[in-house]
Amino acid sequence: MLVGLIGYGAIGKFLAEWLERNGFEIAAILDVRGEHEKMVRGIDEFLQREMDVAVEAASQQAVKDYAEKILKAGIDLIVLSTGAFADRDFLSRVREVCRKTGRRVYIASGAIGGLDAIFSASELIEEIVLTTRKNWRQFGRKGVIFEGSASEAAQKFPKNLNVAATLSIASGKDVKVRLVADEVEENIHEILVRGEFGEMEIRVRNRPMRENPKTSYLAALSVTRILRNLKEGLVV
């Protein structure tokens, strides 16, 4: 399977090494910095390379700049920076391009778990609440930094709350979000879901990547799960 990577930071480098170890072929890596034999500097050159799927591991802006072009080029896309879809107009455009081209956008679960159960129960969900706890030093104070909707959270804290946007897509609801600056060394996500189906509580304590303490290891691993499913016949 031929895979293109967008972004060559901590996650991009991890994925490049993982792909080479697991029988995938890197078609191209798009980034303005860094060095790799498959590196390209622009989207046009990136799209000239033959590939089965592209992986975004860069930024919300990269998703907005490149998603539609990638899909129109006949390439499926895996997205990590899901906060880009807090822009409802952009989300609608991407869905329309998928419908017209027959291509797919795969939403990586990122730094959380339980998305399969949340998506399964989405039609019966009455309330979904995300509480994210981060080290207070990032904000210079302790306490509740933000409380509001997922759409507001993604706009005010675009680098912090891709998780909120992912939950909104999976649940079909505008998730209630609390961002708390706390005495924690690892990012913690607590998800409470209530509805006619029952109740779910999901708690994830993320270990950061050594290369970038602001990036969770689980986020990178969530992309490898999608890639394994695309390659293998048995999908989990």
Curated annotation (Swiss-Prot):
The keyword Magnesium belongs to this UniProt entry's keyword annotation: no
Binding site for NAD(+): 10-11, 31, 58-59, 66, 80-81, 111, 162, 212-215
Native species: Archaeoglobus fulgidus (strain ATCC 49558 / DSM 4304 / JCM 9628 / NBRC 100126 / VC-16)
pH dependence: Optimum pH is around 11.6.
Any further remark recorded for this protein: The iminoaspartate product is unstable in aqueous solution and can decompose to oxaloacetate and ammonia.
Any one GO MF annotation of this record: NADP binding
Family recorded in the similarity comment: Belongs to the L-aspartate dehydrogenase family.
Catalytic activity: L-aspartate + NADP(+) + H2O = oxaloacetate + NH4(+) + NADPH + H(+); L-aspartate + NAD(+) + H2O = oxaloacetate + NH4(+) + NADH + H(+)
Keyword NAD: yes
Name of the featured protein: L-aspartate dehydrogenase
Keywords from the named record: NAD, NADP, Oxidoreductase, Pyridine nucleotide biosynthesis
Dependence of activity on temperature: Optimum temperature is 80 degrees Celsius.
Biological function: Specifically catalyzes the NAD or NADP-dependent dehydrogenation of L-aspartate to iminoaspartate.
Residues the record marks as active site: 189
Gene coding for it: nadX
An annotated GO BP: NAD biosynthetic process
